[in-house]
Amino acid sequence: MTAEDSATAMNSDPTVGSSTKVPEGVAGAPNEAALLALIERTGYTMVQENGQRKYGGPPPGWEGPHPQRGCEVFVGKIPRDVYEDELVPVFETVGRIYELRLMMDFDGKNRGYAFVMYCHKHEAKRAVRELNNYEIRPGRLLGVCCSVDNCRLFIGGIPKMKKRGEILEEIAKVTEGVLNVIVYASAADKMKNRGFAFVEYESHRAAAMARRKLMPGRIQLWGHQIAVDWAEPEIDVDEDVMQTVKILYVRNLMIETTEETIKKSFGQFNPGCVERVKKIRDYAFVHFTSREDAVHAMNNLNGTELEGSCLEVTLAKPVDKEQYSRYQKAAKGGGGSAEAVAQQPSYVYSCDPYTLAYYGYPYNALIGPNRDYFVKTGSIRGRGRGAAGNRTPGPRGSYLGGYSAGRGIYSRYHEGKGKQQEKGYELVPNLEISPVNPVAIKPGTVAIPAIGAQYSMFQAAPAPKIIEDGKIHTMEHMISPIAVQPDPATAAAAAAAAAAAAVIPAVSTPPPFQGRPITPVYTVAPNVQRIPTAGIYGASYVPFAAPATATIATLQKNAAAAVYGGYAGYIPQAFPAALQVPIHDVYQTY
């Protein structure tokens, strides 16, 4: 065969012609030639779908299952004009790439981030170590971290009498790719579940499709409406770290089971091997002196019964405190203004957290009986699930969801040890009054705006020692300097008021303070029409029987008072003074 015959045969072969076809998503790209050269060099496929361009998946000659969880890394801070022809040579230096997914925009540029999946887990970890902050362009650094491949859904609204097998069977009927179902027994009645379950799927895609299918209003299970959301993905702990763990996580305990009973049960194989036990509701952490004793106890006691309850025993997962704090913020949509603190499991709040978050720290500090926990963080949404599935406060919003099956992350309860209780603000130092329900309330000085020296006769009343005295006598102390006495001419004044009502002008000056009244407006003289004034809390006047003070005389001589005629002997009820008012009168707490 000559060279011409060979060329003719190649041109007539349809497979050869199809191999030169430009893949969809590559045709028309700014760097089309570079992408085609990359495909020819590596033999990988490239296709664009659903706003992302997939390179590989699987690679040429791949045989075997899909790479395990933890083989994918997230790549961020990618320049908008960088594509696979520059990314692949960088990331293939640390391992074999199974798949690279570059998020694309409609204008043909990338969206600044991508996902790279390796064939093995150790290659992904190496990529994080070596390629994070890699300078892809002068002055442009890539951000590389482990990707959270969430394959777990939270499903609520499950009938409490359903068993794990029934739930697994029902979920598998309506969704695909179900691997496992995690169901927690009720702490009070082990024959019932807690009304929710965690469903694990074989891949993130399968979980996403199941979530879309199970959205509320589309499917009912056992005739019940269900709630579906992403669960908090289980935190991945390095295998080398897990090899040093000597703490066991024990769940499904009875509420009545004591720490002494748990210590005796787990220490039966080697007396003295258990250092201590920390029990929280229906789960516990058992600390051993050596890892061998912990593993031996786990193998022998997992699945056994203790005081009528079947135990689930696993190795606890240690988590770096700083890493866990960052993870919590990312998983719940970013932290709020509250400082990150340890989660306190299972506290029943007697007050509405939506309302408390509005008033802020000083008001939260007065609310009982759980005020110590309200001031630490504002609970709006995104409620986390602790190791035993209990609700705990979390910041508003949910990026990866607000629920977690928990697997014994024992660093949580270490956070709160030896921590000082936060105290509220003491507005008036060194003054104690009787506690109420059972909060100790500090009195505070409430300064009403527009205080003037001309009203010096209105002195602040002494702070009462008892709250009840403050309620009863506050107004009495306020009006006592005026020396209000019964006026025999009250009836005549009322008649004059009725006659002058039509000629009294309205005051157009807006009130200088648009706040709510601290106390109600009182009218001392009956049947006297109120005059609209530029008062701060209301329009009302108090009559004087004997205006003897210099201040009142000045008021009567004031030209502005002349237009009021017979009302010049009255003074506004809204006293511009400083007075002592108990805080509970300002912010009602009961």
UniProtKB/Swiss-Prot annotation:
Pfam families: RRM_1
Gene Ontology BP annotations: 3'-UTR-mediated mRNA stabilization; cytidine to uridine editing; hematopoietic progenitor cell differentiation; mRNA processing; positive regulation of interleukin-10 production; positive regulation of type I interferon-mediated signaling pathway; regulation of alternative mRNA splicing, via spliceosome; RNA splicing
SUPFAM superfamilies: RNA-binding domain, RBD
Record PTM Omega-N-methylarginine, positions in chain: R396, R407
CDD domains the record matches: RRM1_RBM47, RRM2_RBM47, RRM3_RBM47
Function: Single-stranded RNA-binding protein that functions in a variety of RNA processes, including alternative splicing, RNA stabilization, and RNA editing. Functions as an enzyme-substrate adapter for the cytidine deaminase APOBEC1. With APOBEC1 forms an mRNA editing complex involved into cytidine to uridine editing of a variety of mRNA molecules. Through the binding of their 3'UTR, also stabilizes a variety of mRNAs and regulates the expression of genes such as the interferon alpha/beta receptor and interleukin-10. Also involved in the alternative splicing of several genes including TJP1.
Full protein name: RNA-binding protein 47
Compartments where located: Nucleus; Cytoplasm
Domain RRM: 71-149, 151-233, 246-318
Asymmetric dimethylarginine, modified sites: R396, R407
Keywords: Cytoplasm, Methylation, mRNA processing, mRNA splicing, Nucleus, Repeat, RNA-binding
Keyword RNA-binding tagged: yes
Keyword Transcription included in the entry's annotation: no
NCBIfam families recorded: hnRNP-R-Q (TIGR01648)
Complex and partners: Homodimer. Interacts with A1CF. Interacts with APOBEC1; form an mRNA editing complex. Interacts with RBPMS.
GO cellular component terms, A-Z: apolipoprotein B mRNA editing enzyme complex; cytoplasm; nucleus
Region (Disordered): 1-25
Family: Belongs to the RRM RBM47 family.
